[in-house]
């Protein structure tokens, strides 16, 4: 820095110190200028805040945002064109539903519904990706340019104006001690900077409809996202309602105990022509008989009670649910699903 530059910096610092510490008054700018300066300051703050909050709106998870930023930085360093996309919550939920829907199988009503919902969630994630790209290109990038160019340029003019004001005020108070030419130059430079700063702020604020247009584009993108999401969800809701109606019309199956599978050696113990010893009866195995799988306590007249493992002689099949048989000299009816046939009734 030149000697003249050092002197000017000293003058500015001296004047600033005088104003801050001693309470000396500097040159006051007009109210209209100060109002424009205030609006520019607020605009600077709101643009910075909107850029941050819009990113949070599109990508709410800070950990994912940090990871994504790191991965994309590494990709750029490596010269890779393809970047990693933000994992949308709809997509993550859709992946979960698809995974377990497929595990439940095609014969599961719940499983099939999970697959339908999962596929719809994946579609919504794609729509959200489109929103991210659209908003970045049409809203975030223009705002970033506004911050980096227009507002930065205005800030530069205001900073330069403040420096020249301090230099002007310092020299104005020392008229007679400082050459008149230096004072005159300080006045000219101050007025020049004021005019530049004032014009740049005026032009920016007069054209703020451009920012309104950017907001309108952002809202249009958000509306399109919600419209497409609504269509996907409405179609999904119709499918689920149809699935519920279809499931309601299917007759309910009744639970039937399934007999435990046993090997022939476990069932017979000996050849079918031998006699099996049971609790209280010796029954030749060449006549129709069955083995009790569970204890059966008769509740109605005519029913035949027995214990698990008892061998019952079969005399008749009443219908698809009941047998007639004998044990311990007593005869009666008993449910088919309580026994396992050893020697079937003749056809």
UniProtKB/Swiss-Prot annotation:
It comes from the Eukaryota. Keywords: Coiled coil, Cytoplasm, Endocytosis, Endosome, Lipid-binding, Membrane, Phosphoprotein, SH3 domain. Residues 285-344 form the SH3 domain. Residues 18-249 form the BAR domain. Brain and testis. It is found in: Cytoplasm; Early endosome membrane. An N-terminal amphipathic helix, the BAR domain and a second amphipathic helix inserted into helix 1 of the BAR domain (N-BAR domain) induce membrane curvature and bind curved membranes. Implicated in endocytosis. May recruit other proteins to membranes with high curvature. This is Endophilin-A3. It comes from Homo sapiens (Human). The lineage of its organism: Eukaryota, Metazoa, Chordata, Craniata, Vertebrata. The gene is SH3GL3.
